[in-house]
Amino acid sequence: MADMAPARALALVLLAVAVGSALMAAAQDAPSPPTPMAPSPSTDETPPVWLKAHATFYGGADASGTMGGACGYVDLYSQGYGTRNAALSTALFNDGASCGQCYKIACDRKRAPQWCKPGVTVTVTATNFCPPNWNLPSDNGGWCNPPRPHFDMAQPAWEKIGIYRAGIIPVMYQRVPCVKKGGVRFTINGHDYFNLVLVTNVATTGSIKSMDIMGSNSTDWMPMVRNWGANWHSLSYLTGQMLSFRVTNMDGQTLVFRNIVPSGWKFGQTFASKLQFK
């Protein structure tokens, strides 16, 4: 029995070595844990897209000829739009739904380096409509003919990016948020049973998707209809009542301007709110 002890001990050692080798091999064959992935960069901000168009100018050196227009802003100076404005072709005007939108524009030096001022852009507000001219071809005078995207800019704005002698320049443009001071403003025109409300000084999208009105004698909102440009109308009799507006911009943000118009209002008055789209 004593002679068998060394042999048994040797056998146990060999067994332990074999088991250890098997465990190491199994560990090597097992799949390794996944390597932690680095977080992907945020895709919340989409790079701005630049689109091609052309631009001409009108209105004179002081832009006085751009007053009025198909959006209904009348005096662009007093409304805060100034000389940084443009008339849009049919492809961009969208039957007036684009009124108030803002566009950053740069002269396209790749297409016309001799007529571009380098390294500058200008931001303009859509305040007018550039009608088509069917008597002229789209590439020779009929610049605003569909489906061409075209900006007929106020001359001072155009001259920020282009050389005057060119007359027309190729441009790159993109929609940008509108920056405004103060709140949204409402100007009431029309007459009894026809309330025509001009909405101005709209920030962010610059334009309005839908609008409702409510008189102080009711608790029901009544939808308004875009009449032309930035003017919305209601056929209800609201004279002598305080007026509230519910306005939704093109991004879907809704603001309620409750009793923004006092009961003693008159046609032709403008009422400035303290609320603004963000």
UniProtKB/Swiss-Prot annotation:
Keywords: Cell wall, Cell wall biogenesis/degradation, Glycoprotein, Membrane, Secreted, Signal
Glycosylation sites: 217
Protein's cellular compartments: Secreted, Cell wall; Membrane
Signal sequence region: 1-27
Keyword Signal listed: yes
Domain Expansin-like EG45 residues, every copy: 68-183
SUPFAM superfamilies per record: Barwin-like endoglucanases, PHL pollen allergen
Entry annotated with the keyword DNA-binding: no
Residue ranges of domain Expansin-like CBD in the record: 193-273
Physiological role: May cause loosening and extension of plant cell walls by disrupting non-covalent bonding between cellulose microfibrils and matrix glucans. No enzymatic activity has been found. May be required for rapid internodal elongation in deepwater rice during submergence.
UniProt record similarity statement: Belongs to the expansin family. Expansin A subfamily.
Name the record gives this protein: Expansin-A24
Lineage: Eukaryota, Viridiplantae, Streptophyta, Embryophyta, Tracheophyta
